[in-house]
Amino acid sequence: MLNVVIVGASGYAGAELVNYMHRHRFANIKKIFVSKNSLNIDKLFSDVHQQFKNIVDLRFDTIRNCTLIKKNIDAVFLATDHRVSHSLVPFFLSSNCIVFDLSASYRMNNKKVYLDYYGFVHEYEELLKNSVYGLAEWEQEKIKKANLIALPGCYATCIQLALKPLIKENVLCDKNIPIINAISGVSGAGRKASLNNSFCEVSLQPYNIFTHRHTPEIIEKLGVPVIFIPHLGPFSRGIIATITCKLKPNVKSIDIHNIFNKFYKNKPLIRIYKKYLPSIKSVEKQPFCDIGFVIKDDYIVIVAAEDNLLKGAAAQAVQCFNVRFGFSETESII
């Protein structure tokens, strides 16, 4: 039985982590933490997330006390602000914990991105070099040996899973940049209240065009330029991305289907559609990324959908945990 700690358990993604790890047959949640200024300190998890009443009744502790339990902890999940994770990761690594970081703090190879997009100077360049990017379907061999797994962003997960096979097989026209329109539910902005995410204000609207934090992540990990246009949608959870690309001549639908099948046939959390297209409804509260496509002439529109809190966050983190420790990839997830 592995002892785990979850930091940031009061947030949406953190709560999903608690749910998964509570069900995990080979893990024991030793402690759950919230920030030092949180109003939830000393409250029960089930008081904050009432759907877990009499299921998970662990008590929140302040992050200040996490230094007291560093012994006998096998793994830690960080569902925290980027700057908080930036500071906590070295501490837990020095305590011989395997770290699964859901923030962006260790995703990127280029530390300049953190100043340009996240507003802080990254102080641990060596850890950036040694972290393993936790796109579970593509990095399993590296994840098996990693001490620091940096989980991808929610948008970045959905978009990469849709595009990587086609880029890998070199079927996209080099002269045309993929154009990505993606819509996320308001839970992607976190649990903290804000006017833009309030019931009467939320709408369908684009935001942070060319400046979204996931843009450099997507470009770096795909290795090709893209135009990424994120949108906030009037629903609570889920992401749907429509990606328009130009194909090289004579690429047919059967070729694309065979490519997706080649890479994802034995990947239980990827579902490929042959006749239909994914929707938010098909992935809401599910740990899958669903992918479909339509081709006309030399153009392809790929549609990918996931739950931003699950495959875009907690489910992928637990998937990486399972891979790292040699469990079934879907243990406690499905």
UniProtKB/Swiss-Prot annotation:
CDD domains: AGPR_1_C (cd23934), AGPR_1_N (cd17895). It catalyses: N-acetyl-L-glutamate 5-semialdehyde + phosphate + NADP(+) = N-acetyl-L-glutamyl 5-phosphate + NADPH + H(+). GO terms for cellular component: cytoplasm. Its EC number is 1.2.1.38. Signal peptide: none annotated. Keywords: Amino-acid biosynthesis, Arginine biosynthesis, Cytoplasm, NADP, Oxidoreductase. Its main location: cytoplasm. InterPro entries: AGPR_AS, AGPR_type-1, NAD(P)-bd_dom_sf, NAGSA_dehydrogenase, Semialdehyde_DH_NAD-bd. One of its GO terms (molecular function) is N-acetyl-gamma-glutamyl-phosphate reductase activity. The active site is at C154. Pathway: Amino-acid biosynthesis; L-arginine biosynthesis; N(2)-acetyl-L-ornithine from L-glutamate: step 3/4. It is found in: Cytoplasm. It is an enzyme of class 1 (oxidoreductase). SMART domains: Semialdhyde_dh. GO terms for biological process: L-arginine biosynthetic process. Belongs to the NAGSA dehydrogenase family. Type 1 subfamily. NCBIfam families: argC. Catalyzes the NADPH-dependent reduction of N-acetyl-5-glutamyl phosphate to yield N-acetyl-L-glutamate 5-semialdehyde. This is N-acetyl-gamma-glutamyl-phosphate reductase. It comes from Buchnera aphidicola subsp. Acyrthosiphon pisum (strain APS). The gene is argC.
